[in-house]
């Protein structure tokens, strides 16, 4: 059977999505369970989700499924029922509905088979991914935040942590989840007897991280059920204080969900308070960075004068300049800061 996939251009698909009048619901979900034939599972799921006009990104692996999708609001319940009945392990699957949603998060459906649904780099065959830490619900999270014996650990990337996090949460300063796992084990060694509370966007990374910590001898390990998304939703529903500050970064066109009114990040170009992530407009760069409205005008939506200069060239001149250059300009590395003098990133105090 040929691989089922979309054949329409991204430009046309995006135009179709923007022209839609029916509201869409953005939702994420994941589940660790054994899939015997990931390719067959992927193809059957592609057919089922296409019928329901679902857009988004879905990863399938032998260890489970990880998805961020949008669906017409009128078809949400049908999609949920379809997933519940698709495999016994997906019955009553937790669905994390977006908190701050304009329905324009995705415009194409992509399902990919991967080695892992989260790239963890774990090769230890004795590792048991099912031996996870204890789940924490919203009220329990708030109680832990007031517990001096609890250490909150953010298992997201730097650019996610930068725009939003729990007060005093430990950042693991690595560019990838696979690098964070061994770093977390080392960084928390002095807190091994404390309560280790791990969290991430929707739960998938912190669940595996909690199992990794237990595998490495940590006993009092917890993780927030459903991640930041589920925590904020349940806290609001139950009338509890939402203790997460700032934005929750998301991996779609929205680039973030507003959780609180706090703006804790700063423009990477002028240092003014700002938490608006953008991609550099230069096709040879597309760096993800934080840019305020004033700097967007000043730098023509680019990350640096170098990219402004390149953007002003003809398409042929741009291609010639980019020839042989590896991985774009790499002006600002996500966790290691300034890599080029072409972009000044001031501290908040400057």
UniProtKB/Swiss-Prot annotation:
The active site is at 200 (cysteine persulfide intermediate). Keywords: Oxidoreductase, tRNA processing. It catalyses: uridine(34) in tRNA + AH2 + O2 = 5-hydroxyuridine(34) in tRNA + A + H2O. Residues 146-240 form the Rhodanese domain. SMART domains: RHOD. It is an enzyme of class 1 (oxidoreductase). One of its GO terms (biological process) is tRNA modification. Gene3D superfamilies: 3.30.70.100, Rhodanese-like domain. Its EC number is 1.14.-.-. Coiled coil: none annotated. GO terms for molecular function: oxidoreductase activity, acting on paired donors, with incorporation or reduction of molecular oxygen. Belongs to the TrhO family. Catalyzes oxygen-dependent 5-hydroxyuridine (ho5U) modification at position 34 in tRNAs. This is tRNA uridine(34) hydroxylase. It comes from Erwinia tasmaniensis (strain DSM 17950 / CFBP 7177 / CIP 109463 / NCPPB 4357 / Et1/99).
